[in-house]
A protein has these predicted regions:
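A short glycine/serine-rich beta->alpha loop
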Residues: 189
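Glycine-rich, acidic/polar active-site loops that bind/position phosphate-bearing ligands
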Residues: 1-184, 192-197
Length: 199
């Protein structure tokens, strides 16, 4: 197959190694990775959006670019508490146990004051992401207890996708330095809101 550098997505240094975002396809053009279909869909949207705009008489537009800012929701759990739950350590989610004593009536948590330990984690995370050129505009508590959200600055779709993959990896590494575990599973706890990724 062919390996091609995606020059629209920035190269970066991770753990003293230069990482270059690439696309990989077969000699016949079949996609062998997850990036090639994304790049092709961006091209298809550009082509069809231009066609529609030109039909409506807007001939000045030469290119249509998609952008996205995937807000990443996550749970932060103390490492000692996490290690006591084998289902969490093996599956990243709870499989048994009693339902929480309260449901979603803890509305004081959503956008409430961030606990100092979590604020330190978020500040450290921001710095690590900044080193990779990933800018976050908002971090806040989410609805469920111990649930939080990071909202990045919008950027071109393929760059935002690369940034989100890096963000999830860095979130877990930074959490470990703070004695925490970052759970990215969409529904780690039954009976409370799950984590989503939305625009």
């Amino acid at each position: 197959g062919y390996t091609a550098w995606d020059p629209t997505s920035y190269a970066f240094i991770k753990d003293k190694a230069l990482c270059i975002p690439t696309a990989f396809c077969s000699y016949g053009g079949e996609a062998l990775d997850k990036k090639t279909p994304l790049l092709r869909s961006m091209q298809a949207l550009n082509k069809q959006a231009l066609r529609v705009l030109h039909l409506f008489g807007n001939e000045d537009v030469k290119c249509v670019r998609t952008s996205v800012g995937p807000e990443q929701e996550y749970f932060l759990v103390d490492r000692e508490m996490f290690d006591k739950r084998k289902d969490l350590t093996f599956c990243g989610r709870t499989l048994f146990g009693a339902k929480p004593p309260k449901g979603q009536e803890m509305d004081d948590h959503y956008f409430g004051a961030i606990k100092p330990r979590v604020a330190e984690y978020m500040a450290d995370l921001n710095e690590e992401l900044w080193k990779l050129g990933i800018l976050a505009k908002t971090e806040h508590n989410e609805v469920a207890p111990a649930q939080h959200e990071l909202a990045p600055i919008y950027t071109t779709t393929n760059v935002a996708t690369d940034h989100n993959q890096l963000t999830m990896e860095i979130m877990q590494k930074v959490a470990a330095r703070h004695g925490l575990v970052c759970l990215l599973h969409e529904k780690p706890f039954e009976g409370v809101n799950g984590s989503g990724k939305h625009n």
